[in-house]
A protein has these predicted regions:
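Glycine-rich beta-strand-turn "strand-cap" elements at beta-sheet edges
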Residues: 2, 39-48, 78-116
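Active-site-flanking beta-strand signature of metal-NTP-handling nucleotidyl enzymes
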Residues: 3-8
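Short hydrophobic/aromatic beta-strand micro-patches
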Residues: 9, 41, 55-57
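Short, surface-exposed ligand-recognition loops at beta-strand->loop->(often short) alpha-helix junctions
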Residues: 10-18
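Serine/threonine-rich low-complexity intrinsically disordered regions
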Residues: 14, 60, 70, 105-107
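Intrinsically disordered, low-complexity segments enriched in polar/charged residues with Gly/Pro
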Residues: 14-15, 26-27, 31, 42-45
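An amphipathic, aromatic/His-enriched active-site/gating alpha helix that lines ligand/cofactor pockets
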Residues: 20, 24-36, 51, 57-96
């Protein structure tokens, strides 16, 4: 399993616009092989920005890489600079990718996953 995250520092007076942009966008992720789930997270408020993070779970790292080379990726990111997105941000977004090495479920089951 692979988790891809992007951190966004959103200007305080643009939080509503940022949230609406994400909540109203059409996602093609469910059509992409290897996609598991997506979450948009709202984090702590800082002095000059609100922290948000997108959290996408992929079956494998290879599935994530294939998505980054797909039409679905290009389509989703072609609009990334539209809707005044840069004026919403307190700086560029920051990508973070993680290989899952352990999984613990609510039923108590635990799985160790070989690091890739």
């Amino acid at each position: 399993m692979y988790i891809a995250m992007n951190r966004f520092r959103v200007l305080l007076d643009r939080r509503q616009d940022f949230e609406q942009m994400w909540l109203s966008r059409e996602s093609r992720l469910p059509e992409v092989p290897g996609f598991v789930e997506f979450h948009m997270l709202k984090g702590p408020e800082r002095e000059d920005h609100q922290l948000y993070s997108s959290h996408t779970v992929w079956r494998t790292y290879e599935d994530f890489v294939a998505w980054t080379k797909s039409d679905a990726f290009r389509s989703a990111h072609a609009r990334a600079g539209n809707n005044n997105t840069p004026t919403m941000m307190a700086g560029p977004s920051e990508f973070e990718g993680f290989h899952v090495i352990q999984e613990v479920k609510s039923d108590g089951s635990k799985k160790v996953i070989a690091a890739e």
